[in-house]
């Protein structure tokens, strides 16, 4: 009976849970009363989820699905330190899986229908994943007092709770998901690298993605901008991905573990996806005052010998990022921890902004910005604060370190002189987005300027776009002409924070493709909904910016779409 009451509550919240009003700027906004839930153990050892914020329970959550009103779902989970670490994390996972089970299915369905040609993963991938889990469990048993492996174990326990919560909430036998399904969902962005490693090891299975799918490597734009007067440091990220992946969530985890966990960060807030414990974008705010983000470099040659270095005897990136964010206390320590157990999958340029090192109006201390880049069998990182002191750090899917660039195939010779080329044959400084960052970043003076820049796409008028809507900060590949060359892919969000915001632990985010200079994206236009079947998404993405905290969210005045760079 309790399960039925909770499910009815979730449904009623979807229908009636928000009130539209006018803010002081006469802009429409949503003032939401976010439903709260708690979880405890029953006498039979099973979990019970019930309405209300019971501070004596194992964990409490605020959850609402506002995809149709603001383009985001929202979940915030807090655990009770009176319970042991394993119970806290498993209950937190269960609570998330139970409450967001509908969004989880929508995310899974959209991925399977559009990404995998056979609507399934191959046996080789599943065998690889099982071997990887076996390796981690062995290391957990051998290193029971090591904080690194203690935290790896906590991630696996959270995933197990997530699976069980989903299974108990889901009433549809056609929508059952196993623990292996959740493992595959969480490692999804790493599967292409693993498939390439299996191919190079003469594996019998190698499945090409659906032809509709975006580039195997997720691409993004990121900017870390220091104001001229040293009064503010902005950090922003725009995710590039397939539009079918736009079932989105902002998540906040406040886990209060024992000293054995050695956590330097108890609270994290990030943009993410239902059923996935990492950000994927990636964009994290930590209460240690670190902000962690990345753009994907990848490996240019699918036949590269580097793929042979990918082995199951490692820890995948999706787990390493959670562990590292929790136990790192600085940019340098973050790099040292993240280097451990390098899987060589999801090879990114990571940026770690340490707001503890930024003294407003005075100086930017060494260690404010570290950059970390990864390949199979090799990593490189450095303190690049000196570059930030010149005004900004850009990130646009091209390696910064020369060795990484050479090894991953970005610096091969080419006769092409077209600066619009995305082949990787041009200099780091000559990529279109690199030139846009250089031209426009010093025109950012306010948070509104920064928001507008992270959403910028004026490809028809920007000479650096070379007529290509993909050569902008927030790409719109759906606007490519002729239409038969277009794809429903591009920038799907933007997130920004700053010293002022992180001191309040606030993130400002906008969901969906940019619609400042360009028209909003609609599934009903250009026959997109037939080419990319999706569920759980609105037809049109024309949402405003929203400010998120660890307990609530609300409107934020939109960045001016009249700003021209």
Curated annotation (Swiss-Prot):
CC annotations in GO: extracellular region
Glycan attachment positions: 53, 84, 118, 200-201, 211, 266, 302, 406, 485
Keywords: Glycoprotein, Hydrolase, Lipid degradation, Lipid metabolism, Secreted, Signal
InterPro entries recorded: PLipase_B-like
Source taxon at top rank: Eukaryota
E.C. numbers: 3.1.1.-
Gene Ontology biological-process entries: phosphatidylethanolamine catabolic process; phosphatidylinositol catabolic process; phospholipid catabolic process
Pfam families attached to this UniProt entry: Phospholip_B (PF04916)
GO MF terms held by the record: phospholipase activity
The UniProt record lists the keyword NADP: no
Localization (cell): Secreted
Major subcellular location class: secreted
Signal peptide: 1-21
Purpose of the protein: Probable phospholipase.
PANTHER family recorded: PHOSPHOLIPASE B-LIKE PROTEIN B-RELATED (PTHR12370:SF4), PHOSPHOLIPASE B-RELATED (PTHR12370)
Family that this chain belongs to: Belongs to the phospholipase B-like family.
Protein name: Phospholipase B-like protein C
Organism name: Dictyostelium discoideum
Lineage: Eukaryota, Amoebozoa, Evosea, Eumycetozoa, Dictyostelia
């Amino acid at each position: 009976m309790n399960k039925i009451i909770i499910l009815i509550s979730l449904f009623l919240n979807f229908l009636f849970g928000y009130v539209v009003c006018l803010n002081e700027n006469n802009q429409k906004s949503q003032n939401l009363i976010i439903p709260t839930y708690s979880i405890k153990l029953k006498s039979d050892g099973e979990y019970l989820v019930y309405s209300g914020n019971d501070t004596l329970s194992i964990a409490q959550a605020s959850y609402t699905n506002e995809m149709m009103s603001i383009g985001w779902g929202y979940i915030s989970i807090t655990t009770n330190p009176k319970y042991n670490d394993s119970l806290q994390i498993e209950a937190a996972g269960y609570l998330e899986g139970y409450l967001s089970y509908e969004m989880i299915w929508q995310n899974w369905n959209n991925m399977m229908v559009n990404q995998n040609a056979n609507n399934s993963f191959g046996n080789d991938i599943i065998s690889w994943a099982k071997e990887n889990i076996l390796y981690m469990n062995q290391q957990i048993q051998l290193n029971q007092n090591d904080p690194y492996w203690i935290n790896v174990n906590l991630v696996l326990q959270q995933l197990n709770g997530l699976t069980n919560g989903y299974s108990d909430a889901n009433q549809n036998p056609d929508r059952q998901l196993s623990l292996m399904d959740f493992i595959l969902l969480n490692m999804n962005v790493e599967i292409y690298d693993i498939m390439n490693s299996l191919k190079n090891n003469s594996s019998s299975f190698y499945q090409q993605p659906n032809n509709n799918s975006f580039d195997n490597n997720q691409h993004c734009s990121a900017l870390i901008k220091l104001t001229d007067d040293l009064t503010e440091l902005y950090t922003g990220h725009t995710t590039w991905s397939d539009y079918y992946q736009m079932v989105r969530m902002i998540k906040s985890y406040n886990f209060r573990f024992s000293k054995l966990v050695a956590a330097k960060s108890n609270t994290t807030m990030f943009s993410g996806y239902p059923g996935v414990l990492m950000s994927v974008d990636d964009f994290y705010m930590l209460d240690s005052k670190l902000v962690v983000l990345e753009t994907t470099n990848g490996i240019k040659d699918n036949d590269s010998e580097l793929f042979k270095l990918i082995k199951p005897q490692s820890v995948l990136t999706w787990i390493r990022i959670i562990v590292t964010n929790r136990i790192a206390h600085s940019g340098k320590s973050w790099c040292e921890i993240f280097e451990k157990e390098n899987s060589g999958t999801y090879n990114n340029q990571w940026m770690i902004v340490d707001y503890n090192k930024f003294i407003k109006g005075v100086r930017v201390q060494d260690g404010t910005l570290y950059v970390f880049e990864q390949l199979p069998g090799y990593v490189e990182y450095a303190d690049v604060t000196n570059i930030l002191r010149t005004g900004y750090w850009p990130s646009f899917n091209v390696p910064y370190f020369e060795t990484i660039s050479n090894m991953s195939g970005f610096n091969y010779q080419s006769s092409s002189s077209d600066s619009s080329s995305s082949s990787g044959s041009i200099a780091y400084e000559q990529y279109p987005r690199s030139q846009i960052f250089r031209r426009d970043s010093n025109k950012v003076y306010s948070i509104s300027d920064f928001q507008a820049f992270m959403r910028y796409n004026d490809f028809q008028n920007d000479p650096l776009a070379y007529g290509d809507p993909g050569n902008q900060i927030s790409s719109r590949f759906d606007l490519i002409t002729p239409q038969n060359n277009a794809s429903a892919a591009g920038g799907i969000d933007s997130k920004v924070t700053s010293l002022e915001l992180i001191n309040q632990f606030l993130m400002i985010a906008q969901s969906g493709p940019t619609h400042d200079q360009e028209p909003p994206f609609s599934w009903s236009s250009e026959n997109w909904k037939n080419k990319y079947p999706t569920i759980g998404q609105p037809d049109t993405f024309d949402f405003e910016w929203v400010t998120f905290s660890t307990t609530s969210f609300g409107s934020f005045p939109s960045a001016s779409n009249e700003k021209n760079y």
